[in-house]
Amino acid sequence: MAQYLLSVYQPDGPAPAPDFLEPIMRDVEALNRDMKAADAWVFGAGLHPTETATVVRQQGAEVLITDGPFAEAKEHVGGFTVIEAADLDAALGWAEKLARATTLPIEVRPIQH
């Protein structure tokens, strides 16, 4: 089976209020249980806010280390799930369920091995 990265994109800004976020997290946990029961779930995690990011890049002969995200954007990767699926259509099916659970855009990309 192929593996796919499901990236969850969230808008920049403060975290949602707990009363908004708690039902979403319950739905995500239920979906994760469904993925595990179907042997589709490999790994997943949420990410700390973008202000905790550090970027390392080569510039000429030097390596530069800077605080913050790589690029300014209106949204950023806030979490991800790695799944195994028979094909892209099956991966898109899981991504649709994740988009409904999170109410956020999900990017689906095959993983190279």
Say what each PLM segment does.
Residues 1-113:
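Conserved, structured core segments of small domains
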